[in-house]
Amino acid sequence: LILPFNPRKASGFREGSLQMAPRVKLRLLEGTYGVARLSADASIPAWADGTGFLSISRTDDELSVVCRQERIPHDVKADTGWNCLKLQGPFAFDETGIVLSVIEPLSTNDIGIFVVSTFDGDHLLVKSKDLEKTFELLANAGHSCI
């Protein structure tokens, strides 16, 4: 099955309007984050819980934990040095183009990103070394960081 790609829908274009998806406010969360990888059969670690953003995902291949990096033990495989920006929602599940409008200016400028979605919103993680450039690119795209 091959589905046609509609770039107007993906970009947030609205029929009858030349407007793009709504501009998004993003809030920088305190702290620096890490993404830890555990074996697929690992128990959810107690060290993951605490202040700040936390996301735990399990697949057939792994258990991933996103949390403040100071909580990740040194003997756990992890990629650290991420900052977390929360897209100020909530956004409806059927609202299209929101995340794309934020990640497009970053990915086209070689900024590596990691997005985690929750029921009420989305969280964008960018490397700390790219944070200043991220703010600049998002502002140029019409978004605001608070």
Language model regions located:
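Regulatory modules associated with amino-acid/nitrogen control
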Residues: 16-105, 133-146
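Generic hydrophobic-segment detector
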Residues: 2-4, 87, 124, 132
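A generic alpha-helix propensity feature with a strong bias for hydrophobic helices
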Residues: 7-10, 76, 108
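A structural feature that tracks compact, well-ordered secondary-structure segments
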Residues: 90, 95-129
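N-terminal amphipathic/basic-hydrophobic helices that include classical n-h-c signal peptides
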Residues: 1-19
